[in-house]
Amino acid sequence: MKILFDTNLWISFMIGKRLASIKDVLCRHDVEVYVCEQLLDEIRIVISRPKFDNIIPQETRRRFFEMVYDVCLFTDITVDAASPIRDVKDLYLLSMAESVPVDYIVSGDKDLTELGGHKGIPILTYNQLIAILHQNT
């Protein structure tokens, strides 16, 4: 199963909220999680905001990126997605999803989840993904 996580889920993972089980997803041998440099750049930009200084320690950030580089598969964006999406900054995620192609886009962003899917690729919440993974266990 090929998966793409949106930035907000990665940030939640670093903060250690209920999405801590994302580590379990990353360690499954039937799951491949894809990232691209643009996604990692967006994560770096978000966590560099002052409000995260006291929430995500530098050591957590360092370990996070080490884990991503160790566990995730990197891809280039080779497709320019066109979609009626409110936040055009998210278009690169849809382009990346098409480029791989992934089986699922997983996001906590209502703008994306309300789309329901993009070019046959379902856009799920994290809880929906976990339900699918439990069915496949």
Please provide the spans of the model-predicted regions.
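Hydrophobic/aromatic ligand-binding patch that stacks against planar heteroaromatic rings
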Residues: 25, 96, 115
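Short, well-structured N-terminal submotif of metal-dependent ribonuclease cores
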Residues: 1-35
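Residues that scaffold the ATP/ADP-binding catalytic core of kinase and kinase-like folds
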Residues: 12-13, 46, 55, 115, ...
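Residues at secondary-structure transition points
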Residues: 17, 34, 59, 84, ...
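Acidic, PIN/NYN-like endoribonuclease modules and their adjacent C-terminal/linker elements
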Residues: 100-106, 110-137
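A secondary-structure boundary/capping signal
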Residues: 6-7, 35-36, 108-109, 125
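Active-site neighborhoods of divalent-metal-dependent phosphate/nucleic-acid chemistry enzymes
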Residues: 70-105, 110
